[in-house]
């Protein structure tokens, strides 16, 4: 299928969203000047290693396809600094080379049956937002606490039973979505989240709330619906007294 988009030397953006491609036309890989490439919604099952030639890309959208793997060559796209969309595919793992994208700001790998995130995830210190919702994760790597610029972390709908205490080092974190997991508690190491505003814990089998929750200085909203936590606990009472919206 020919690509009916401008192909001049100055072309920097190519939008092939929902074209029913099945495979990526070879001529796409020849456009080495591309900065933005959108391939979402095409039923893609694989990608050519030739993607390595698109070194000027800062945004790549591979969402809503049928990918079971992403080639390791993606790690060579070190100009990929803005957005990488991998959501709604069939990925069980992410390529290890992904962590070479240390300046990437936004990564959406949600809606995949991911069983783990890369163990050295923490080197991706440019990340401001990380989405890995609706997968098969049971925990996070310890290195996640090194994502020093992370502001939003979305982990809804996984199988997470425990979290590393290193998350308490995420000094820029504003929003943490943990709803619909299997958490029975939170580690004390998470007490150091000075900017956390919204914490969603709904639909987790929580046994108790740690006392440090009441001491989070910026917390504005805590969602505890469908957790079994009652309104008569000291943590809930203290948060409510401070003006934090606690949903039960």
Regions found by a protein language model. Give the residues of each.
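Conserved hydrophobic beta-strand positions in leucine-rich repeat
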Residues: 12-14, 37-39, 60-62, 82-86, ...
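Leucine-rich solenoid repeat scaffolds
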Residues: 198, 203-248
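Eukaryotic tandem repeat interaction scaffolds
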Residues: 111-201
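LRR N-terminal entry segment and analogous cap-like coil->beta motifs
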Residues: 7-46, 81
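The feature encodes a structural signal of leucine-rich repeats
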Residues: 24-27, 47-50, 70-73, 94-96, ...
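Leucine-rich repeat
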Residues: 8, 30-33, 52-57, 76-80, ...
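N-terminal capping/linker segments that flank leucine-rich repeat
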Residues: 1-24, 235-248
């Amino acid at each position: 299928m020919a690509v009916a988009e401008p192909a001049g030397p100055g072309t920097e953006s190519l939008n092939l969203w929902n074209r029913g491609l099945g495979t990526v036309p070879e001529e796409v890989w020849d456009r080495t000047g591309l900065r933005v490439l959108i391939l979402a919604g095409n039923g893609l099952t694989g990608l050519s290693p030739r993607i390595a030639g698109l070194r000027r890309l800062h945004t790549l959208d591979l969402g809503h396809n049928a990918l079971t793997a992403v080639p390791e060559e993606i790690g060579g796209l070190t100009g990929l600094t803005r957005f990488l969309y991998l959501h709604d595919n069939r990925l069980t793992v992410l390529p290890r080379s992904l962590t070479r994208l240390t300046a990437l700001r936004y990564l959406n790998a949600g809606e995949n049956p991911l069983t783990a995130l890369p163990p050295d995830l923490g080197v991706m210190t440019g990340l401001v937002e990380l989405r890995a919702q609706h997968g098969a994760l049971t925990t996070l790597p310890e290195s996640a606490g090194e994502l020093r610029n992370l502001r939003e972390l979305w982990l809804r709908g996984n199988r997470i039973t425990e979290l590393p205490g290193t998350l308490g080092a995420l000094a820029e974190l504003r929003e943490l979505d943990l709803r619909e997991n299997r958490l029975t508690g939170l580690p004390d190491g998470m007490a150091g989240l000075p900017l956390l505003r919204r914490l969603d814990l709904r639909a987790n089998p929580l046994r108790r709330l740690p006392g440090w929750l009441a001491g989070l200085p910026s917390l504005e909203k805590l969602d505890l619906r469908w957790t079994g936590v009652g309104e008569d606990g000291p943590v809930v009472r203290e948060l409510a007294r401070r003006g934090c919206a606690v949903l039960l």
